[in-house]
């Protein structure tokens, strides 16, 4: 739904549902010279006329479509005639007028094409104008619908709120309620009746309101006047005149009559004053009613004027459209006459050509009659042969047409087969696409897994590099520690053991990669460990024996020999036990070194394979 504002300040809406089924009725009424109804008649009797503006517009759109079809057919006919005229051969070389005829016909056809294009443009412009008119009509109808809705809302509000429950509100009698209900139940076509009823009720309500207000003000004025009269000296004289005895009334009768006459005059003046106060109220009331009536009349007159202007504009537009239709019909008639004349000229030209050809043949026959008499029989035979050939050619033509039809059928079947194959290929393509998509998803998953493995291997490589650096530091510290220990023990060791220790230390230091060649370094280190352990043990035992000999110098020599013998036995047993432990520990360390070396090689191979896979993936997916 499209909303827009028109210059008169009314808010209109344009619905897309244009009821275009009753166009012919409005156009018939316009053509027959019927008068357009006024605003009141159109709004109160719209249901009987069934909205005649919309069918006219629909009929015009149908006419436009039919005219466009006729124009296209005429253009096709003209093109066919032009091609036919262009392909007619110039059989008579002495007839140069055929080219001039074709040029003349071409010029006529071009002029007709220009007129057709101009008519098409005019039709499009009129179609746009009709659409704008239809939109304006719909907006006015929707505006009237909005007015009806507001009136219905006001009437329902009056019926619900002006009831007997509210004491201060205006009470509706039975007739007023019935008229309001009947007006509320009327359809949206009776806008003015609803407006009249609503305006009458509002006027009556305002009159009652002003009348009640004037009565209240008059009562208030009377009360104020009485209070003033009682407080004045005339009021006190009236009271004193009501209270005296009958004796005073009889004696002073004349005086009392004078006073009564004066008091009556005073009361008359007071009544005149009261009437003068009520006059402005009635004047205000009448003035308000007059202004309200004039405003309502002005509004109704404005609505009448707008409706009349709208109907006049529609009438002018439809008159223009009728004139345009007449012009188009005349142009089409002229075009059909031109086409008929072209056809007649074609037929006449073909007849003339045939006659010229026959005349030339007759002249030739007259000139060569003597020669043709001798060859007449041969010509007859040739004619018979030509007829036979013609029959044969017609049969061949029929067979060729049949063959062409069969070929067309075959081509149709072939096209259908190709379409089926295309559909099958489309299905296979979609299936293969799904398969490739699944494979791609799997490859993405594998790529993700390989990336994770590569990350884990990188982490392991970092850990191994840390282990390797730590091992190198540990090996260097261990060798320094062994050198320091050997320097300490060098004072009491033999030269052969010192040389052996130097060779082992040099061989250990000469190994390039200590972590990878751990199986070569491990036994040498273990031998150094055992060498140092035995040296320390012998030193400790000798030290202990020296301490014992120093503590007991008085013991006999025999006990000394026994003591020296027992430590030597213990030392030998200790050395044997240490040798066994050294051998078992060396074997265990060899096994551990071999296992760690195999594990390192497996990890390196896995790292290389993952690197190659990652390189291949980077090449395949740039």
Curated annotation (Swiss-Prot):
<dbReference type="GO" id="GO:0110121">
    <property type="term" value="P:gamma-tubulin complex localization to cytoplasmic side of mitotic spindle pole body"/>
</dbReference>
<dbReference type="GO" id="GO:1905721">
    <property type="term" value="C:mitotic spindle astral microtubule end"/>
</dbReference>
<dbReference type="GO" id="GO:0099609">
    <property type="term" value="F:microtubule lateral binding"/>
</dbReference>
<keyword id="KW-0132">Cell division</keyword>
<dbReference type="GO" id="GO:0051010">
    <property type="term" value="F:microtubule plus-end binding"/>
</dbReference>
<keyword id="KW-0131">Cell cycle</keyword>
<dbReference type="GO" id="GO:0005816">
    <property type="term" value="C:spindle pole body"/>
</dbReference>
<dbReference type="GO" id="GO:0000741">
    <property type="term" value="P:karyogamy"/>
</dbReference>
<dbReference type="GO" id="GO:1990734">
    <property type="term" value="P:astral microtubule anchoring at mitotic spindle pole body"/>
</dbReference>
<dbReference type="GO" id="GO:0051301">
    <property type="term" value="P:cell division"/>
</dbReference>
<keyword id="KW-0597">Phosphoprotein</keyword>
<comment type="subunit">
    <text>Homooligomer. Interacts with CDC5, KAR1, KIN4, SPC97, SPC98, STU2 and TUB4.</text>
</comment>
<protein>
    <recommendedName>
        <fullName>Gamma tubulin complex adapter SPC72</fullName>
    </recommendedName>
</protein>
<dbReference type="GO" id="GO:0005876">
    <property type="term" value="C:spindle microtubule"/>
</dbReference>
<dbReference type="GO" id="GO:0031122">
    <property type="term" value="P:cytoplasmic microtubule organization"/>
</dbReference>
<feature type="region of interest" description="Disordered">
    <location>
        <begin position="221"/>
        <end position="263"/>
    </location>
</feature>
<keyword id="KW-0415">Karyogamy</keyword>
<dbReference type="GO" id="GO:0030953">
    <property type="term" value="P:astral microtubule organization"/>
</dbReference>
<dbReference type="GO" id="GO:0031578">
    <property type="term" value="P:mitotic spindle orientation checkpoint signaling"/>
</dbReference>
<dbReference type="GO" id="GO:0044877">
    <property type="term" value="F:protein-containing complex binding"/>
</dbReference>
<feature type="compositionally biased region" description="Basic and acidic residues">
    <location>
        <begin position="239"/>
        <end position="250"/>
    </location>
</feature>
<feature type="compositionally biased region" description="Polar residues">
    <location>
        <begin position="228"/>
        <end position="238"/>
    </location>
</feature>
<feature type="region of interest" description="Disordered">
    <location>
        <begin position="1"/>
        <end position="58"/>
    </location>
</feature>
<keyword id="KW-0206">Cytoskeleton</keyword>
<dbReference type="GO" id="GO:0061499">
    <property type="term" value="C:outer plaque of mitotic spindle pole body"/>
</dbReference>
<dbReference type="InterPro" id="IPR024545">
    <property type="entry name" value="Mto1-like_Mto2p-bd"/>
</dbReference>
<dbReference type="Pfam" id="PF12808">
    <property type="entry name" value="Mto2_bdg"/>
</dbReference>
<dbReference type="GO" id="GO:0005824">
    <property type="term" value="C:outer plaque of spindle pole body"/>
</dbReference>
<comment type="function">
    <text>Spindle pole body (SPB) component that acts as the gamma-tubulin complex-binding protein of the SPB outer plaque. Anchors cytoplasmic microtubules at the half bridge of the spindle pole body (SPB) and accordingly functions in nuclear position and spindle orientation, including anaphase spindle migration into the bud. Recruits KIN4 kinase to both SPBs when cytoplasmic microtubules are defective, to delay mitotic exit. Links cytoplasmic microtubules with spindle orientation checkpoint (SPOC) components and, therefore, could function as part of the sensors of spindle orientation defects.</text>
</comment>
<keyword id="KW-0963">Cytoplasm</keyword>
<dbReference type="GO" id="GO:0007020">
    <property type="term" value="P:microtubule nucleation"/>
</dbReference>
């Amino acid at each position: 739904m499209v909303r827009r504002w028109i210059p008169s300040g009314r808010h209109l809406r344009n619905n897309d549902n244009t009821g275009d089924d009753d166009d012919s009725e409005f156009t018939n009424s316009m053509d027959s010279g019927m008068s357009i109804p006024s605003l009141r008649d159109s709004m109160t009797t719209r249901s009987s006329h069934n909205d005649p503006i919309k069918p006219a517009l629909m009929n015009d759109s149908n006419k436009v479509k039919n005219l466009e079809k006729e124009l296209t057919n005429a253009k096709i006919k003209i093109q066919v005639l032009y091609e036919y005229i262009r392909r007619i051969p110039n059989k008579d070389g002495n007839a140069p007028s055929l080219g001039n005829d074709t040029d003349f016909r071409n010029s006529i056809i071009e002029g007709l094409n220009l007129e057709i294009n101009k008519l098409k443009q005019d039709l499009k412009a009129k179609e746009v104008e009709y659409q704008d008119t239809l939109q304006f009509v719909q907006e006015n109808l929707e505006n009237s619908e909005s007015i009806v809705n507001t009136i219905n809302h006001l009437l329902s509000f009056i019926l619900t709120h002006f009831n007997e429950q509210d004491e201060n509100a205006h009470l509706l009698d039975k007739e007023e309620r019935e008229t309001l209900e009947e007006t509320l139940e009327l359809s949206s076509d009776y806008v003015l009746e609803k407006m009249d009823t609503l305006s009458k009720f509002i006027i009556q309500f305002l009159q009652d309101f002003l009348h009640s207000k004037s009565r209240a003000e008059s009562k208030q004025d009377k009360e104020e006047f009485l209070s003033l009269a009682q407080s004045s000296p005339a009021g006190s004289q009236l009271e004193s005149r009501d209270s005296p005895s009958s004796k005073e009334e009889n004696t002073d009768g004349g005086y009392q009559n004078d006073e009564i006459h004066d008091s009556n005059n005073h009361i008359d003046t007071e009544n005149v004053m009261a009437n003068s106060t009520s006059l402005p109220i009635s004047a205000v009331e009448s003035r308000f009613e007059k202004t309200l009536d004039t405003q309502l009349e002005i509004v109704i007159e404005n609505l009448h004027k707008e409706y009349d202007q709208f109907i006049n504009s529609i009438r002018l537009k439809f008159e223009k459209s009728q004139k345009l239709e007449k012009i188009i019909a005349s142009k089409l008639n002229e075009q059909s006459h031109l086409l008929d004349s072209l056809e007649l000229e074609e037929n006449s030209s073909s007849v003339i050509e045939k006659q010229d050809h026959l005349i030339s043949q007759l002249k030739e026959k007259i000139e060569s009659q003597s020669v043709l008499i001798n060859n007449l029989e041969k010509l007859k035979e040739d004619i018979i042969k030509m007829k036979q050939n013609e029959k044969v050619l017609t049969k061949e033509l029929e067979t060729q047409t049949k063959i062409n039809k069969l070929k067309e059928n075959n081509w149709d079947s072939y096209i259908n087969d190709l379409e089926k194959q295309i559909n099958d290929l489309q299905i296979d393509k979609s299936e293969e696409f799904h398969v490739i998509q699944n494979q791609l998803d799997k490859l993405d998953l594998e790529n993700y897994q390989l990336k994770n493995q590569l990350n884990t291997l990188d982490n392991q490589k970092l850990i191994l590099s840390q282990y390797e650096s730590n091992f190198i530091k540990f090996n260097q510290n261990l060798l320094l520690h062994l050198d320091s220990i050997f320097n300490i023990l060098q004072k009491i060791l033999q030269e052969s053991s010192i040389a052996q220790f130097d060779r082992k230390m040099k061989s250990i230091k000469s190994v390039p990669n200590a972590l990878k060649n751990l199986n070569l370094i491990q036994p040498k280190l273990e031998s150094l460990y055992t060498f140092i352990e035995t040296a320390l043990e012998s030193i400790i035992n000798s030290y202990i024996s020296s301490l014992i000999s120093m503590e007991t110098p008085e013991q006999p020599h025999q006990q000394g020999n026994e003591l020296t013998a027992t430590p030597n036995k213990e030392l030998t047993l200790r050395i044997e036990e240490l040798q066994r432990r050294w051998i078992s520990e060396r074997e265990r360390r060899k096994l551990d070194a071999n296992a760690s070396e195999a594990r390192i090689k497996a990890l390196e191979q896995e790292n290389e394979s993952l690197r190659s896979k990652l390189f291949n993936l980077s090449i395949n997916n740039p």
